[in-house]
Every structure is written in C-alpha cells, then in structure tokens.
C-alpha cells in the first residue's frame, strides 16, 4: 500500500521517543494526545476552533457512533469529517470494533464479521472488516483503524489465541479493502492511512506473536489495543514492554484508550508515541481537574471562596480568567458553562503535558521529568 506518511524519530532517551508523524492533514509532533470527539464534537461543548486554541493536534472520532448517527453516507455527502466538523488537522477514526463488543447487545461473531443490535434502537447491523473500511472511507479520516475483535478481560488463553488469529485475518482484509476503495476512487480521502491493532489480552506470548505477525504487513502505524480495560496498571505496563521490541522502529506506536497523566508518562518511557482517552473530558464534567500538583475535586466545599485559578501554573484561558469559586458555583448549579470551562482546562492540561514531554525529550531531561511527575500528577489533593 503506497503511503504518504512518514514517521521520523528525532531523538530517543532510553525507550522514550521524540518524533514527527507527517500526514496529508499536517504533521503531528510526537508524543501526542488525541482529543476524543466521539460524534464529531468534544462532550462539554468544545468546537474545532476551541481545540485549535488549546493546542490540540489530533481529533479522534468514533466510527460506530457516526455510522449510526448521522450516518457515514451523509458525512461523505457533506465532504467528509474535516469539512463537516471544520477541523482541518489530522483525524483518527476507530474501527467500531470496541463499541461493537462493549456497547452492542446480542452479538454474533463469525469469520465474516459481527452481527449486533444497535444500542440506539435495537435494529440489526452487520459489521466486518470490509464494512468498517467502507464506513471510514466515507468519513474520510486521516487515519483508519483496522477492524479487530476485542475480547473480554480476562479471557481464556485458547480463545484469546483464536481471536488474535481472526484479528490478523481481518486486518489483511481491511488492507485489501482499503486498497480497493482507493483504487476505485471511492474514499473521500485518497491518502487515508491504516493502523493495525495488537491484541492478546494479558498473555505476553500471544501479544508478542501477534505483533510479529502484523508487523510483517507494513502498515502506516501500529496500535496496542485491549488494555486499560480493568487489568492492574502494572500488568498493562508489562504488556507494553513485552510488545515494544517487536514494534517497527520506523512506524508510529499508539496505545489505545490510555489514560491518566501518569499512565501517559510511563507509557512514553516504554516507547509509545500516541494516546487517546475520554478521561480528561469525562473527569472534567464531574469536577475532577488536572493540575501540576495533582487532581483536585472542584466541587469540594473548601473551594467555595477560593479566588485562585484552578492551577496557578496553568496558562489556559480558564485559569487566566476565572476563579475556583466561580467554576465550583457553575458546576454545582449545573450551568453548561461550568462543563465547558472544566473540559477546556483538562484538555489544555493534557495537550500541554504532551508538549512538556516533547520539550523534556528535546532537552534530554525526560527521565528526571518522569521521576518527578509520574506519580504526582495522578495524586488526589
């Protein structure tokens, strides 16, 4: 598959990587965080312009949800996700696999794909590798994720092994279908990229073998999936370390669905380049806010008369203009502005955390940064 993307490793400190990822929609400085806009918008009322203002590089949209509503064909008729959302930077769409296996009811898995009931109205839907690629071609995202089977954790070793083998077969079908869609001029984005997903539950032998298999397919990037789903954090870190030596050095590496600031710092130290998580926006809507001293619950009574910003060390528009007392009032009163401001702050924090990580890697001081902040940033204060 011809590719216009280039991952360039600029600097390395132990396993931590500082790089650039070039796409048709712009160059991503890595390590980077992808901001989760499930249905084409950040929950909490942030627009594409807001994302630009807070320093976001990449937006992540959800194939399953957009397929159900408003429909991927409508998005294609509107010119694709970039025109539809007015976000002109890179967009990654997941394959829909995780939602099919976590949200949908009455699933039936076959070699062809998965039949399931919509969580919206119960109507029957079939999705397999070809369908996932067709939907993502209509969406016109920068990066399409391959359709994979997401097994429950824990799962039996034998079933996990069979699932990995099926995911590899599905990946080959995804690659072939993307090539067909491009060749026939069907894809909204003819330069769409394909990432494969490593699975294997928490079995190191399966993880390593699966990574070896999919690395041979010469894809545009590689993701580690099926983690951060309830297993102990140390087990997640161990799986990353087991898989990392077998991930192509010249391709971008993506850890799906992770995580806390501490998780991200630790995963960067273990060789990961790209992240996504709903945590910063979800936590913000409930008043749990990230600071450089740890996590505060702005709803606590002690902030009722606090005139300070959320984080005196933060330069976001929220911290430059509003007090803890005011933001607490907004959330307690269920004012929409409260959610908007807290989500804006947390996403600013995450995106600027990544910028700080890149700066530390550039300066050769990431290890010291890791040791200082990996636990501190996840501490509740």
Located regions from the model:
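Glycine- and acidic
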Residues: 153-156, 161, 221-227, 336-339
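A non-catalytic, amphipathic alpha-helix used as a structural packing/dimerization or gating element
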Residues: 131, 135, 162-173, 209, ...
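Non-catalytic, usually N-terminal nucleic-acid engagement modules in DNA/RNA processing proteins
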Residues: 1-188, 301-304
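Glycine-rich phosphate/ribose-binding loops and adjacent secondary-structure elements
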Residues: 165-168, 177, 181-183, 189-310
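C-terminal extensions of enzymes
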Residues: 1-20, 28-37, 44-45, 148-154, ...
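Short acidic/polar active-site loop segments enriched in Thr and Asp
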Residues: 57, 142, 220, 273, ...
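Conserved, mostly hydrophobic/aromatic
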Residues: 26, 59, 94, 136, ...
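Generic secondary-structure signature for well-ordered alpha-helical cores
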Residues: 141, 172, 176-179, 245-248, ...
């Amino acid at each position: 598959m011809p590719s216009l993307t280039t991952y360039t490793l600029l600097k390395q400190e132990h396993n931590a990587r500082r790089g650039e990822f070039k796409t048709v929609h712009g160059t991503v400085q890595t390590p980077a965080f992808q901001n989760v806009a499930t249905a084409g918008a950040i929950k909490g009322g942030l627009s594409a312009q807001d994302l630009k203002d807070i320093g976001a590089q990449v937006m992540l949209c959800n194939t399953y949800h957009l397929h159900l509503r408003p429909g991927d064909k409508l998005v294609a008729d509107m010119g694709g996700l970039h025109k539809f959302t007015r976000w002109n930077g890179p967009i990654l769409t997941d394959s829909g696999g995780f939602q099919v296996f976590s949200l949908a009811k009455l699933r039936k898995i076959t070699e062809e794909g998965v039949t399931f009931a919509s969580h919206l109205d119960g109507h029957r839907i079939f999705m397999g590798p070809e369908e996932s690629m067709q939907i993502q071609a209509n969406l016109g995202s920068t990066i399409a994720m391959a359709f994979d089977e997401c097994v429950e954790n824990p799962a039996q070793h034998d079933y996990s092994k069979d699932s990995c083998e099926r995911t590899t077969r599905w990946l080959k079908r995804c690659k072939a279908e993307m090539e067909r869609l491009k060749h026939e001029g069907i894809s909204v984005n003819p330069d769409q990229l394909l990432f494969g997903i490593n699975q294997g539950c928490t079995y190191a032998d399966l993880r390593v073998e699966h990574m070896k298999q999919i690395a041979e397919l010469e894809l545009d990037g590689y993701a580690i999936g099926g983690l951060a789903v309830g297993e102990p954090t140390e087990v997640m870190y161990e799986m990353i370390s087991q898989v990392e030596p077998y991930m192509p050095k010249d391709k971008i590496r993506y850890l799906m669905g992770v995580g806390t600031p501490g998780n991200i710092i630790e995963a960067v130290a273990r060789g990961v380049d790209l992240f996504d998580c709903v945590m910063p926006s979800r936590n913000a809507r409930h008043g749990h806010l990230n600071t450089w001293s740890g996590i505060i619950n702005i709803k606590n009574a002690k902030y009722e008369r606090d005139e300070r910003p959320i984080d005196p060390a933060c330069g976001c528009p929220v911290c430059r203009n509003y007090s803890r007392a005011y933001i607490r009032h907004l959330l307690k009163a269920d004012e929409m502005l409260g959610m908007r401001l807290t989500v804006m702050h947390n996403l600013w924090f995450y995106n600027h955390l990544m910028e700080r990580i890149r700066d530390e890697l550039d300066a050769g001081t990431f290890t010291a940064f890791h040791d200082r902040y990996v636990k501190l940033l996840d501490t509740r204060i």
